[in-house]
C-alpha cells in the first residue's frame, strides 16, 4: 500500500495477542470487530472504517484497552470532534482503565457526560491535604472572579502541578486532534508509545 505517496512494505508486529479479545465492561465483539482488533494489534498503522452504528467506537475502545494493557506506556486517543472524544472516553472508562479527558480551556464550561473524567474537573475534585492551597485559591477565584498577581501565579503553579500528576497517572488520555497539541501535554513527561 501507499502512505503519503510512498510505497510501504507490509509489516507484522510481534506481539503477545491476548487470549480473549473482548474487553471488560464492553459488549462482546462480533466477527468483523474481532478480525479488526486482531489485525490492528499486529500492525504499526491501521484504518478502521464503516457506516454509523457498526461498532467502531466499541472496537476502538477495545483496541485501546489491549494497547494499554500491553504496558508499553500511555495511550493517546484522538478524534476530530468533542462528541466523538466524549463517546470514546466513556467506552474506554467502562473497561476499568484510568482515563483522562483533556478539553480546551474554552470548553471547560460546557457540561458533558464525562465531566468526572475531565482534567479540569479532576483538579477541582482533589481534596488531599497537599492540595488545600489550590482548593482555597480556586474558591477565592470563583468568588472574586480574579486573584491578585501573587496569588494568581501561585494558583497557576499549583494547578499545573496537579494537572501534571493526574496526566502522568493516566493509562489513557483522550482529546481532539487539535487538543493533542495542548501545552499541558507537552509540559508533562508523558510516555506515549501509542496513539
Regions inferred by a protein language model and the residue ranges of each:
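The Walker A (P-loop) glycine that initiates the GxxxxGKT/S ATP-binding motif of P-loop NTPases
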Residues: 50
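Conserved P-loop NTPase motor core of helicases/translocases
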Residues: 1-22, 65, 71-78, 83-192
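Short hydrophobic/aromatic beta-strand immediately N-terminal to the Walker A/P-loop
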Residues: 46-47, 76
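Walker A (P-loop) phosphate-binding loop of P-loop NTPases
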Residues: 53
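Motif I (Walker A/P-loop) of helicase-class P-loop NTPases
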Residues: 57-65
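Residue-level signal for alpha-helix termini/capping positions
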Residues: 41, 68-69
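N-terminal pre-P-loop "Q-motif" helix
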Residues: 25-44, 59, 175
